[in-house]
A protein has these predicted regions:
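Conserved nucleotide-binding/hydrolysis micro-motifs of P-loop NTPases
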Residues: 8-11, 62-66, 89-96, 149-150
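Conserved phosphate/pyrophosphate-binding and hydrolysis machinery centered on Walker-type P-loop NTPases
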Residues: 37, 61, 88, 114, ...
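A glycine- and Lys/Arg-enriched "phosphate-lid" helix/loop adjacent to the NTP-binding pocket
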Residues: 26-27, 75-127
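NTP-dependent small-molecule kinase module
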Residues: 122-169
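Short glycine-/polar-rich loops that comprise or flank the Walker A/P-loop
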Residues: 1, 78-84, 136-141
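ATP-dependent small-molecule kinase phosphotransfer cores
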Residues: 2-73, 77, 105, 115
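Residue-level signature of catalytic and energy-coupling elements of molecular machines
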Residues: 7, 43, 57, 86, ...
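Short, well-ordered secondary-structure micro-motifs
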Residues: 68-69, 96-99, 154
Length: 169
């Protein structure tokens, strides 16, 4: 499986000054989510770079129902599909603390302001939470506790994947 991180794809496009990267950078600097079309177009390019393959692990994508439907269509064209989605459940105060800490080391403008972080969390509530229903209706949604060490969180993710694989054997 190929791991595709939306953040890595954004950073690559921004550092290469692609048209999509420059668009994304403008939105991110204002603390806004990157529009669906820009995100989907970047991810389509990335997916096509790795074809053919046996599948993907998407990190940070999709974030809206529109993106999910676009991804479903793209994967269908390649005889692939989403098998399961895993959401890390973290309270807003912990998220704010994590992002402010990340902002110190990354230099990301959108991680250095509580106001911008709160704007992103509000956008998340409005645009990303509907994905829970979208994937839940397909029996593809799993939520795990996203608080703890990286090893603890990884262990929870692995457990969900192993349970899924055991259920479908």
């Amino acid at each position: 499986l190929i791991h595709i991180s939306t953040g890595d794809v954004f950073r690559k496009n921004m550092s290469n000054n692609t048209d999509l990267g420059l668009l994304a950078k403008g939105f991110m600097e204002k603390g806004e989510l990157v529009p669906d079309k820009v995100t989907v177009d970047m991810l389509k390019d990335e997916i096509n770079n790795f074809m053919p393959c046996n599948g993907f692990i998407f990190d940070g994508f999709p974030r809206t129902t529109f993106q999910a439907k676009e991804l479903d269509n793209l994967l269908f064209e390649k005889s692939l599909k989403i098998d399961l989605t895993i959401a890390l459940n973290v309270d807003n105060n912990s998220l704010i603390d994590r992002l402010l800490e990340r902002g110190k080391s990354s230099g990301r403008a959108d991680d250095q302001s509580v106001e911008k972080i709160n704007m992103r969390l509000q956008e998340y509530d409005n645009k990303t939470k509907p994905l829970i229903e979208y994937y839940n209706d397909q029996n593809k949604f799993y939520s795990i506790n996203g608080i703890g060490s990286l090893e603890q969180i990884k262990s929870r993710i692995v457990e969900v994947i192993e349970d899924y694989n055991n259920d479908w054997r």
